[in-house]
Amino acid sequence: MLSLSIALCTRNRIDDLTRCINSIAIGGAPEGCETELWVIDDGELPKHVLERYERQLGRAGITYRYHRKEQPGLWLSRVKTVELAQGDIILFLDDDVELPNNYLTELMSTYEAYPQAAGIGGIAEGMSNSFMGTIRCLLSFQQSWSKGRLSLSRQSGSMYNWHKAKRTFKTEFFHGCNMSFRREAIRGLEPVPWLQSYSVGEDLLLSRIAMKSGPLYINPALTLLHHESPSSRDNMEQVTYMRVMNHIHLLRDERSGPIGYAALYWTTLYQILREKPRKNHAAIQGYKRALKAIFSSQEEPLGGGRLSERHSKKMAG
């Protein structure tokens, strides 16, 4: 049977992390599956907390491992996980999720059912859209007509339709709170300059890299609870600014033509119009700052340029 490495990338969210580990320990390791759990720490977890995790996971048949990073950042935590993990499958979970008891068993069974899969992801409970919300997202290029595809502006709003799925389906992107890959599909992961400070889009980039090794799938049976804890989040202006800027980098790295940038411009304009009635001035300011960079970005690198030559060649086409 395939072996499994679970990675929890965290920073100063002990309550969230403890709740997550509790849910993993209750479910336990899949039968016959060698399972390890890595806590990749950008903060300062107390020693007594770490010792409690080790005892708790040990009773559940899961080997506990810990690494404290020197340089913070979610993408760098992904890179470090790939360096350290020993499992055939690497499962990335946000530290503020809760797993149902059968989650890990269902995940490994899905890999057995889809041996060609480079990655398998799941769904966050409660993510859905109204009919009118779906129409607005389609018209503003925040989602595509297909639940497994990104929009023209490379937005992942299609995931709001994932809850309607009754069976496993192909996708070109994952939700970062709940995604797994064959270790070989993401081996050699490297730092990316534009993902060092803010992580929006890192799940899309990781999915794109893995997809060069094989198809990706979403299994609706892999549904978990995502609390989306607000702690350790950046201010709203920075969040909205980097949300657009990182999508610019995603367009650059896939060598998008003018249509992709035009679509992102329209999506950003829509976001500004949406926030005005709410008087969310910080969000609007962030979007306006990024709006100026969209078309100028097609010629000059922004904060680091492309991925490494190896990965940029893999993603071309």
Task: Please name every model-derived segment.
Residues 90:
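Short aromatic/hydrophobic "clamp" motif used to bind/position activated sugar donors
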Residues 69-85:
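Glycine-rich, basic loop-to-helix element that forms the pyrophosphate-binding segment
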Residues 238-246, 257-317:
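Non-catalytic, C-terminal membrane-associated alpha-helical segments of glycosyltransferases
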Residues 1-26, 32:
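N-proximal low-complexity "stem/linker" segments adjacent to membrane-targeting elements
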Residues 22-68:
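Acidic donor-binding segment of Leloir-type glycosyltransferases
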Residues 140-171:
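Short, flexible, basic/aromatic active-site loop/helix in glycosyltransferases
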